[in-house]
Amino acid sequence: QIMLQPAATSNGLLLLERAETDAPAPFDWHNATVYFVLTDRFENGDPSNDQSYERHKDGMAEIGTFHGGDLRGLINKLDYLQQLGVNALWISAPFEQIHGWVGGGTKGDFPHYAYHGYYTQDWTNLDANMGNEADLRTLVDSAHQRGIRILFDVVMNHTGYATLADMQEYQFGALYLSGDEVKKTLGERWSDWKPAAGQTWHSFNDYINFSDKTGWDKWWGKNWIRTDIGDYDNPGFDDL
């Protein structure tokens, strides 16, 4: 006979488990345990890439700035995710995003960077804030060793906005400013611009001439297609 007695601190609860466990069932997407990660806000594994492309903090609430999470941070947390029973890791789009910021919120009260991966600029490159191709390969290989699949979020609905930083870096688009007005208004580095009294972070758009076709040819090119989304109201005009 074997006598089993609950521990004094278990409130009378006694748990029995099999010594031998069944082999894990084959992976099936219908029964996958998917964990979604907004990579930038998850784990900072490499602080050296936190301010790639001269991105910087706003010195306020940091609502729309990059916080440092990256692919190396995901690698560091794979054991934790495995312990949770995760077998599919869905990560925010790691593609290269617009380098600069746009106005954040309906009131434009903060600068908004593409930390979420929604404003892709180059679908063929990784964003430097996320890491490099070696980091991505290590993440995928290390995840597979733990039985975890890696999924990319792919945001095809829209691409990146025009920002002052990208316009200056890639020399596309057109401004309503000219000559000395440019440096006087936007500064040496356009991405350092901040709203003055009576302005918001949306106000940088007031300096951009979106109707200058010649200035935007380098950005859009000749072979692009635009299509609207079903069930969205058509405003009756084209912002492009």
Task: Please name every model-derived segment.
Residues P26-A32, F42-L240:
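Substrate-binding/active-site clefts of carbohydrate-active enzymes
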Residues Q1-E20:
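Extended acidic/polar, glycine-enriched regions
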